[in-house]
Amino acid sequence: MTGVLTAEMNPETKKTCSVPSPEKKTEAEAHTDGSRERKPCPICPHHCNLSEGGIGLCHARGGVGGKDCLNYGDITSIALDPIDKKPLKRFHPGSTVLSVGSFGCNLRCPFCQNHEIATASRRGGQKASPKELADLAASMKARGNIGLAYTYNEPLVGHEFVRDCAAEIRMLGMKNVLVTNGSFCLEPLEGLIPLIDATNVDLKGFTQSYYDWVGGDLETVKRFIARLAGTCHVEVTTLVVPGKNDRAEEIDALAAWLSGLGDIPLHLSRCFPRHRFEGEPTPPDTLYKLADAARAHLKHVYLGNI
């Protein structure tokens, strides 16, 4: 996209969902056109400048042609998946769910398994309307499909499309499943949250230093999980990265916090080298040890990628 300015996150507002004043200049604007009127994006703590010509860190939101959501209806991946793959172990076990993804993500995990679409500005694919996807989901009921899952990239960077699809799915009496990193401010999502039946949230770690590594904010994710736990079925996944978030004390604290929100299943997954992460795979013994620590607080702890 020649001539399109890419915004960076606002370091001054990284740890809060309070939207900065449009008049306030940030370090990010030193790399763009400082004369542009600020239009802070409200959906995540990065608060990128989406004034005309700007594109957010997620690559899916920007001020281009008067549109904030740049990936509306863009489908890069679609498949009928087992519900276990989300992963959701205690929500309609044995069923399948039509799973769709677009492009864009507001984190920068070195180990991302879907980095081709998560970090893309635009990808070739197909266009689909919310009604078209809902009708496709309904046509697959005979194959065990319970609804639509929003996954693969980070779906909430295009929350308007997720909301519109979810409304169509709800009218058909089917289920909406959200797979997300949870690094989002709640107020812009209040119209969507009541439409979600189940979610798996990637709780990347349980220290802010870890979230600094992946480009996010721990407290924002904790608030997101707590809010969703009050309205729908919630499961949580933590990818265990050697030397980063594999201390028993950290997983113990994470599980203790989750237990205060209710009966939330926790998935501890093994990490393998991919994308920009060149470390060793997580030793299976580490996962077994961490699962024991988590089970001191939680009834349902599962291991993945073993």
Predicted regions and their residues:
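Conserved AdoMet/S-adenosylmethionine-binding subsite of the radical SAM
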Residues: P130-T282
